[in-house]
Amino acid sequence: MKKFASKAVAVVMALVMVMGLASFAFAASDTIKVGVLAPLTGAVAQYGNAVNNGVMMYFEELNANGGINGKQVELIVYDEEGDPVKAVTGYNYLMDQGVVAIVGDVTTGPTKAVVAESQADLTPMITASATAEDVTCQLNEDGSVAMVYENMFRSCFIDPFQGSKMAAFAKEQMGAGTAAILYNTGSDYSVGLTKAFEATAAEQGLEVVAVESYADGAVDFQSQLTNIAAKAPDVLFVPDYYSVIALVAQQAQSAGVKATMLGADGWDSVLGVVTDAALLEGAYYCSGYSTEDTREEVQTFVANFKARYDTDPDMFAAQGYDAAMIMAAAIEKAEASGAKAGSDEYRQAIIDALKATDMDCVTGHVTFNEYNNPEKTAAIINITGGAAKYWGNY
């Protein structure tokens, strides 16, 4: 495995110790090392920190209740800054540290960069929020599945599901007749959602009157939004992350766009960065869960998270918590199998247990299909009165 600079090692180890999860007084046989890959700094740090908070809280609760078969879980967290190259460096570092499994990565690009390495090493992984279809499987040019990455799972739903869901919602629930799309050509996430939205829109009879795009990292969308405004669509689908949505919302108003904006789970936390919530009034997006869901699992999680972090948990925190829960349950079964910790047999036992997952989680009941994806309903969120309100599951 590759080594990396001692300064970076010091940063990672400091993170581990600050978390209070690792107890270096334990003998090696008394601990189980689990890695976490997440962007704790950088452009998508809000996602990474939310996921990491959910993961940490679950394992803290688990350790407080005896750990896994009497062993404490030691989390080793690597901040990859949202960079695919740094994510691979982080993966190699975590493997050097002897982790038996990894919760991560958080966004699609870094996760895909790590998959090839983790597949070769048979490292069990679960991502809380990387939604591109080809995170868990390799696709042919026609979009069909060529190969499933047997070691890679996720607790979130996938891009095609979200894009399709929002097109159907626009037609069936909003009564929209026309739609426009503004998407990021440099983002697998954005491109995947766009393709699915277009396909379902065609099936539903929702006419797409304008499709505009921008390069990754763009901050000026005025020209594209002016073109969209001229088409006067009923809805505008913008499948990107919260930092971009905040900019688009502001510029859409000045460009004269009157359409109701629609988005996907990348919008979660957008109200924390937008200059004026009124710019997104009436918008809808799909999410993995809502704090307003009345199920006991949800309300217990929300109460505990708020007590620990003094804020309500967003979707990323909930999916991080679920990813940790699912992985811990699989590790517990591997521990009971008698396989030597860290061996190929042990890793395969974790993977086999992941495939057989059948459990109630915060974001819903989870089983995995043949592509290692959970199939769940989506929570629809409506931004109204400056707040993100739970519309219902759809």
Label the predicted regions.
Residues 1-3, 20, 392:
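Intrinsic disorder/low-complexity segments
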Residues 1-12:
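Bacterial N-terminal signal peptides that target proteins for export
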Residues 12-20:
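Bacterial N-terminal signal peptides
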Residues 15, 24-394:
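Extracytosolic ligand-binding ectodomains
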